[in-house]
UniProtKB/Swiss-Prot annotation:
InterPro entries referenced in this protein's UniProt entry, alphabetically: rRNA_ssu_MeTfrase_G (IPR003682), SAM-dependent_MTases_sf (IPR029063)
This protein's record includes keyword Iron-sulfur: no
The EC number(s) this enzyme carries: 2.1.1.170
Binding annotation for S-adenosyl-L-methionine: G73, L78, V124, E125, R139
GO molecular function, one term: rRNA (guanine-N7-)-methyltransferase activity
Statement: the UniProt record of this protein carries the keyword Transferase: yes
Name listed for the protein in its UniProt record: Ribosomal RNA small subunit methyltransferase G
Length: 206
């Protein structure tokens, strides 16, 4: 699996220390193991997890500004766990409403020795944080409108950002953004061996 990861990282132009590579592989191994009982992801093949979960998450890293982030609706820890591994100097709160997912994430945190994550079982609209976050990240979580509605209280004002990971560019959603939200950028992401488009939408308060 290390050979496959190295190959993907090379194509993506990403350089990581060996420890982070081993942590990423350890995460995939745990996800594969727990998935059989917990049904955490529809991706069953660990090699495909490297593409569709690991690379698909860490290509976002260069675009994140700040040091405190929350991954809302993290599911089995995506993109929060891979990002926390490759960005050990930042802090990530991983939030999900399902107990079985949070139990899995506790095991990941313990086995990989991740001390820069905090795990929260809660609905996003019921969760508050002080201080607020530099960035609110979501992947396959909801429409932009729902994300902004449910998470409006989480980023620092005015400099905090919303980072939404999408497939095809969501022009219909971008056309109806609230007046107090500014579209900062739409970034086309290149994920090696991944079929289909990937876009990162970056929004901030006006």
């Amino acid at each position: 699996m290390l050979k496959k990861l190295d190959s993907l990282l090379t194509v993506a132009g990403i350089t990581l220390p060996d420890q982070q590579k081993h942590q990423l592989i350890g995460y995939v191994e745990l996800l594969d193991k727990w998935n059989k009982a917990y049904n955490l992801t529809s991706v069953r093949d660990p090699q495909q997890m490297l593409v569709r979960h690991i690379l698909d998450s860490i290509v976002v890293n260069p675009h994140l500004q700040g040091s405190r982030f929350i991954d809302v609706g993290t599911g089995p820890g995506l993109p929060g766990i891979p990002l926390a591994i490759v960005r050990p100097d930042a802090h990530f709160t991983l939030l999900d409403s399902l107990g079985k997912r949070v139990r899995f994430l506790r095991q990941v945190q313990h086995e990989l020795g991740l001390n820069n994550i905090e795990l929260v079982q809660s609905r996003v609209e019921a969760f508050t944080s002080e201080p607020p976050f530099d960035g609110v990240i979501s992947r396959a979580f909801a429409s932009l409108q729902d994300m902004l509605s449910w998470c409006h209280h989480l980023p620092a004002k005015p400099e905090g950002r919303f980072y939404a990971l999408k497939g095809v560019r969501p022009d219909d959603e971008l056309a109806v953004l609230p007046e107090d939200i500014v579209l900062e950028s739409v970034i086309k992401l290149d994920v090696p061996e991944l079929d289909g488009e990937r876009h990162l939408i970056i929004l901030k308060s006006n």
